[in-house]
UniProtKB/Swiss-Prot annotation:
GO terms for cellular component: large ribosomal subunit. It holds the Pfam family Ribosomal_L1. This is Large ribosomal subunit protein uL1. One of its GO terms (molecular function) is rRNA binding. The keyword Membrane does not apply. The gene is rplA.
Length: 232
Protein backbone atom coordinates (compact mmCIF):
# COMPACT_ATOMS: atom_id res chain seq x y z
CA UNK A 1 0.00 0.00 0.00
CA UNK A 2 1.30 3.45 -0.95
CA UNK A 3 1.87 6.34 1.42
CA UNK A 4 -1.22 8.09 2.71
CA UNK A 5 -1.77 11.66 1.58
CA UNK A 6 -2.09 14.41 4.17
CA UNK A 7 -5.88 14.47 3.69
CA UNK A 8 -6.15 10.67 3.98
CA UNK A 9 -4.21 10.82 7.25
CA UNK A 10 -6.53 13.53 8.58
CA UNK A 11 -9.57 11.46 7.61
CA UNK A 12 -8.17 8.29 9.18
CA UNK A 13 -7.52 10.15 12.45
CA UNK A 14 -11.16 11.26 12.65
CA UNK A 15 -12.56 7.71 12.58
CA UNK A 16 -12.09 5.60 15.70
CA UNK A 17 -11.33 1.98 14.84
CA UNK A 18 -14.18 -0.34 15.73
CA UNK A 19 -16.49 2.45 16.90
CA UNK A 20 -20.14 2.47 15.83
CA UNK A 21 -21.35 6.05 15.43
CA UNK A 22 -24.87 7.41 15.70
CA UNK A 23 -26.50 8.23 12.36
CA UNK A 24 -26.41 11.92 13.31
CA UNK A 25 -22.65 11.77 13.98
CA UNK A 26 -21.96 9.75 10.83
CA UNK A 27 -23.88 12.19 8.62
CA UNK A 28 -21.55 15.01 9.70
CA UNK A 29 -18.41 12.87 9.86
CA UNK A 30 -18.71 11.64 6.26
CA UNK A 31 -18.62 15.29 5.17
CA UNK A 32 -15.62 16.03 7.41
CA UNK A 33 -13.51 13.16 6.04
CA UNK A 34 -14.24 13.64 2.34
CA UNK A 35 -11.56 15.69 0.61
CA UNK A 36 -12.32 15.79 -3.10
CA UNK A 37 -12.40 18.41 -5.82
CA UNK A 38 -15.72 17.04 -7.09
CA UNK A 39 -19.09 16.54 -5.38
CA UNK A 40 -18.63 12.94 -4.23
CA UNK A 41 -21.59 10.56 -4.01
CA UNK A 42 -22.66 9.21 -0.62
CA UNK A 43 -23.25 5.47 -0.39
CA UNK A 44 -24.97 3.38 2.24
CA UNK A 45 -24.50 -0.36 2.73
CA UNK A 46 -26.96 -2.27 4.91
CA UNK A 47 -26.13 -5.91 5.68
CA UNK A 48 -29.26 -7.96 6.35
CA UNK A 49 -29.84 -11.22 8.19
CA UNK A 50 -31.47 -12.88 5.18
CA UNK A 51 -30.58 -15.63 2.74
CA UNK A 52 -31.18 -14.05 -0.70
CA UNK A 53 -30.96 -17.50 -2.35
CA UNK A 54 -34.37 -18.24 -0.84
CA UNK A 55 -37.24 -16.63 -2.75
CA UNK A 56 -39.13 -15.85 0.47
CA UNK A 57 -36.15 -13.88 1.84
CA UNK A 58 -35.57 -11.60 -1.15
CA UNK A 59 -35.69 -7.93 -0.11
CA UNK A 60 -36.56 -5.58 -2.95
CA UNK A 61 -38.31 -2.24 -2.88
CA UNK A 62 -38.66 1.37 -3.90
CA UNK A 63 -38.00 4.49 -1.84
CA UNK A 64 -38.46 8.21 -2.51
CA UNK A 65 -35.61 10.04 -0.80
CA UNK A 66 -36.86 13.30 0.79
CA UNK A 67 -33.93 15.29 -0.63
CA UNK A 68 -33.33 13.30 -3.82
CA UNK A 69 -30.01 11.73 -4.79
CA UNK A 70 -28.31 14.84 -6.16
CA UNK A 71 -27.67 12.95 -9.40
CA UNK A 72 -28.86 13.83 -12.87
CA UNK A 73 -30.89 10.74 -13.79
CA UNK A 74 -31.18 10.06 -17.53
CA UNK A 75 -34.63 8.63 -18.27
CA UNK A 76 -35.79 6.82 -21.41
CA UNK A 77 -39.54 6.34 -21.89
CA UNK A 78 -40.65 3.64 -24.31
CA UNK A 79 -44.32 4.36 -24.95
CA UNK A 80 -47.13 4.65 -27.47
CA UNK A 81 -47.33 7.91 -29.49
CA UNK A 82 -50.28 9.23 -27.46
CA UNK A 83 -48.16 9.26 -24.26
CA UNK A 84 -45.05 10.89 -25.74
CA UNK A 85 -45.98 14.54 -25.12
CA UNK A 86 -46.77 13.94 -21.42
CA UNK A 87 -43.51 12.00 -20.94
CA UNK A 88 -41.48 14.82 -22.50
CA UNK A 89 -43.29 17.44 -20.42
CA UNK A 90 -42.56 15.45 -17.25
CA UNK A 91 -38.83 15.68 -17.99
CA UNK A 92 -37.91 12.46 -19.79
CA UNK A 93 -34.57 12.74 -21.61
CA UNK A 94 -35.49 10.34 -24.41
CA UNK A 95 -38.99 9.39 -25.61
CA UNK A 96 -39.96 6.99 -28.39
CA UNK A 97 -40.30 3.32 -29.14
CA UNK A 98 -39.04 1.34 -32.13
CA UNK A 99 -36.03 3.57 -32.87
CA UNK A 100 -34.80 3.23 -29.25
CA UNK A 101 -35.45 -0.52 -29.19
CA UNK A 102 -33.18 -0.81 -32.25
CA UNK A 103 -30.53 1.40 -30.60
CA UNK A 104 -30.56 -0.79 -27.47
CA UNK A 105 -30.28 -3.94 -29.61
CA UNK A 106 -27.15 -2.32 -31.04
CA UNK A 107 -25.70 -1.92 -27.53
CA UNK A 108 -26.79 1.62 -26.58
CA UNK A 109 -27.38 1.92 -22.83
CA UNK A 110 -26.47 5.56 -22.14
CA UNK A 111 -29.35 5.89 -19.65
CA UNK A 112 -30.06 5.32 -15.97
CA UNK A 113 -33.75 4.32 -15.95
CA UNK A 114 -36.19 2.96 -18.53
CA UNK A 115 -39.93 3.52 -18.02
CA UNK A 116 -42.52 1.80 -20.18
CA UNK A 117 -46.16 0.71 -20.42
CA UNK A 118 -47.63 -2.78 -19.87
CA UNK A 119 -48.68 -3.01 -23.54
CA UNK A 120 -45.06 -2.42 -24.66
CA UNK A 121 -43.42 -5.11 -22.48
CA UNK A 122 -43.83 -7.73 -25.23
CA UNK A 123 -41.44 -5.74 -27.42
CA UNK A 124 -38.97 -5.12 -24.60
CA UNK A 125 -38.63 -8.76 -23.56
CA UNK A 126 -36.10 -9.32 -26.36
CA UNK A 127 -33.84 -6.65 -24.83
CA UNK A 128 -33.32 -8.58 -21.59
CA UNK A 129 -29.86 -9.76 -22.64
CA UNK A 130 -28.67 -6.14 -22.93
CA UNK A 131 -30.73 -4.52 -20.16
CA UNK A 132 -30.77 -7.27 -17.50
CA UNK A 133 -27.05 -7.27 -16.58
CA UNK A 134 -27.13 -3.46 -16.31
CA UNK A 135 -30.18 -3.39 -14.03
CA UNK A 136 -32.15 -1.42 -16.63
CA UNK A 137 -35.03 -3.84 -17.30
CA UNK A 138 -38.37 -2.15 -16.46
CA UNK A 139 -40.26 -3.84 -13.63
CA UNK A 140 -43.83 -3.34 -12.36
CA UNK A 141 -42.62 -3.74 -8.74
CA UNK A 142 -40.30 -0.75 -9.08
CA UNK A 143 -42.98 1.36 -10.78
CA UNK A 144 -41.18 1.49 -14.14
CA UNK A 145 -43.94 -0.43 -15.96
CA UNK A 146 -47.02 1.77 -15.69
CA UNK A 147 -49.86 3.38 -17.64
CA UNK A 148 -48.95 6.76 -16.10
CA UNK A 149 -45.45 7.20 -17.53
CA UNK A 150 -45.43 10.95 -16.83
CA UNK A 151 -45.95 10.41 -13.10
CA UNK A 152 -43.20 7.76 -13.06
CA UNK A 153 -40.77 10.14 -14.79
CA UNK A 154 -41.44 12.88 -12.22
CA UNK A 155 -40.91 10.45 -9.31
CA UNK A 156 -37.59 9.19 -10.69
CA UNK A 157 -36.37 12.72 -11.37
CA UNK A 158 -37.29 13.74 -7.80
CA UNK A 159 -35.22 10.98 -6.18
CA UNK A 160 -37.19 7.73 -6.32
CA UNK A 161 -34.84 4.74 -6.42
CA UNK A 162 -35.35 1.01 -6.46
CA UNK A 163 -33.06 -1.43 -4.68
CA UNK A 164 -32.63 -5.09 -3.91
CA UNK A 165 -30.45 -7.21 -1.67
CA UNK A 166 -27.43 -8.75 -3.41
CA UNK A 167 -26.26 -12.36 -3.13
CA UNK A 168 -24.12 -11.42 -0.10
CA UNK A 169 -27.15 -10.12 1.82
CA UNK A 170 -26.22 -6.45 1.36
CA UNK A 171 -28.43 -3.62 0.12
CA UNK A 172 -26.31 -0.89 -1.43
CA UNK A 173 -27.40 2.45 -2.84
CA UNK A 174 -26.44 6.09 -3.22
CA UNK A 175 -28.33 8.48 -0.92
CA UNK A 176 -26.98 11.87 -1.91
CA UNK A 177 -23.90 14.01 -2.39
CA UNK A 178 -21.26 15.27 0.02
CA UNK A 179 -22.54 18.81 -0.65
CA UNK A 180 -25.80 17.90 1.13
CA UNK A 181 -26.20 19.17 4.69
CA UNK A 182 -25.73 16.65 7.49
CA UNK A 183 -29.49 16.84 8.17
CA UNK A 184 -30.32 16.07 4.53
CA UNK A 185 -27.96 13.08 4.59
CA UNK A 186 -29.56 11.84 7.80
CA UNK A 187 -33.11 12.30 6.47
CA UNK A 188 -32.32 10.32 3.32
CA UNK A 189 -30.58 7.55 5.28
CA UNK A 190 -33.48 7.30 7.77
CA UNK A 191 -36.04 7.01 4.98
CA UNK A 192 -33.99 4.34 3.19
CA UNK A 193 -33.42 2.24 6.33
CA UNK A 194 -37.07 2.61 7.44
CA UNK A 195 -38.17 1.28 4.05
CA UNK A 196 -35.87 -1.74 4.38
CA UNK A 197 -37.25 -2.46 7.87
CA UNK A 198 -40.84 -2.40 6.51
CA UNK A 199 -39.80 -5.00 3.93
CA UNK A 200 -38.48 -7.53 6.47
CA UNK A 201 -39.48 -11.02 5.24
CA UNK A 202 -41.57 -12.96 7.75
CA UNK A 203 -39.26 -15.94 7.18
CA UNK A 204 -36.12 -14.00 8.24
CA UNK A 205 -34.87 -15.18 11.63
CA UNK A 206 -32.51 -13.53 14.11
CA UNK A 207 -31.07 -10.03 13.73
CA UNK A 208 -32.45 -8.37 10.59
CA UNK A 209 -30.23 -5.24 10.34
CA UNK A 210 -26.76 -6.65 10.96
CA UNK A 211 -24.69 -3.60 10.07
CA UNK A 212 -24.89 -0.19 8.41
CA UNK A 213 -21.98 1.66 6.80
CA UNK A 214 -21.98 5.17 5.34
CA UNK A 215 -19.21 6.33 3.00
CA UNK A 216 -18.46 8.69 0.16
CA UNK A 217 -16.77 7.82 -3.12
CA UNK A 218 -13.54 9.14 -1.58
CA UNK A 219 -13.80 8.01 2.06
CA UNK A 220 -13.57 5.03 4.35
CA UNK A 221 -16.81 3.46 5.56
CA UNK A 222 -18.26 4.78 8.83
CA UNK A 223 -20.01 2.16 10.95
CA UNK A 224 -23.44 3.21 12.23
CA UNK A 225 -25.19 1.84 15.31
CA UNK A 226 -28.59 0.64 13.95
CA UNK A 227 -30.26 1.55 17.26
CA UNK A 228 -29.56 5.27 16.61
CA UNK A 229 -31.37 5.52 13.27
CA UNK A 230 -34.65 6.71 14.82
CA UNK A 231 -32.99 9.25 17.14
CA UNK A 232 -33.67 12.93 16.50
Amino acid sequence: MGKLTKNQKLAAEKIEAGKAYSLKEAAQLVKDITFSKFDASLDIDVRLGVDPRKANQMVRGVVSLPHGTGKQVRVLVLCTPDAEAAAKEAGADYVGLDEYIEKIKGGWTDIDVIITMPSIMGKIGALGRVLGPRGLMPNPKSGTVTMDVAKAVKEVKQGKIDFKVDKSGIVHTSIGKVSFTADQIRDNAKEFIATIIKLKPSSAKGTYIKSIYLSSTMSKGIKIDPKTVEEN
